[in-house]
Structure formats: C-alpha cells, structure tokens
C-alpha cells in the first residue's frame, strides 16, 4: 500500500472531499485507512468499565485508500506515489517533485 501510518493526506472523493488529516491506522487487507478528523460517525456505546454511562460517541470510520491522496511534504500539494530503488532499498517517491518520501 502506498500510504503509511503518520502520512499527511487529502481526501479526494466522498462527503469529506478536500479535508486533510494524518493517517491513524492502515487496514491493508481491506485496502482502507482511518484518517484523523475525517469521516466522523456516531457510535452507540454500551456501558462498560471504561465508559460507565455509555451513550453516543463520535469516532472516525475507515475510508477506502483510493479516496485519499498523499500530500508531498516539500510542496504541500497532493501527489501520486511511485517507487524507486536507492542503495538496494525500495523507497517511495513523490511523482510531482521527484523527492523521496521515506
């Protein structure tokens, strides 16, 4: 997957189009990501030891990885991601600027 935890991304499709956030979690087997502050849903919580009252809480839901685009740290613009071998290691490369991301 072209995105890693901690990357800054912009949502390019869906109800949160245009919002930016950092990747909290990558679900590679499902090709989905959880982005901080994006795709907020209401979740009904049963009372438990950690939350004795229960109730409705707001939480981030996963979105498809194809709906986000990595933001190039050097230009602060969304870019596609390519791969290149440098010193025998495979590194991610921003397609717009050509700079390595790892």
UniProtKB/Swiss-Prot annotation:
Signal peptide residue numbers: none
**What GO biological process terms does the UniProt entry carry, in alphabetical order?**
translation
Among CDD domains, the record links this protein to: KOW_RPL26 (cd06089)
Q: What does this protein do?
A: One of two assembly initiator proteins, it binds directly to the 5'-end of the 23S rRNA, where it nucleates assembly of the 50S subunit. One of the proteins that surrounds the polypeptide exit tunnel on the outside of the subunit.
Q: This chain belongs to which protein, by name?
A: Large ribosomal subunit protein uL24
Q: In which family does this protein belong, per the annotation? A: Belongs to the universal ribosomal protein uL24 family.
Where does it sit, as one GO cellular component term? Answer: ribosome
One family from Pfam that matches here is: ribosomal_L24
Question: Which portions of this protein are annotated as coiled-coil regions?
Answer: none
Instruction: Return the InterPro entries for the record.
Output: KOW, Rib_uL2_dom2, Ribosomal_uL24, Ribosomal_uL24_CS, Ribosomal_uL24_KOW, Translation_prot_SH3-like_sf
């Amino acid at each position: 997957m072209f995105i890693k935890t901690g990357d800054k991304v912009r949502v390019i499709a869906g109800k949160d189009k245009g919002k930016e956030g950092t990747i909290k979690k990558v679900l590679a087997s499902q090709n989905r990501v959880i982005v901080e502050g994006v795709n907020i849903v209401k979740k009904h919580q049963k009372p438990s030891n950690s939350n004795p009252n229960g109730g409705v809480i707001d939480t981030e839901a996963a979105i498809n990885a194809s709906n986000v685009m990595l933001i190039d740290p050097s230009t602060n613009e969304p870019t596609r991601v390519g791969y290149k071998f440098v010193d025998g290691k495979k590194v991610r490369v921003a397609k717009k600027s050509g700079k390595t991301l790892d």
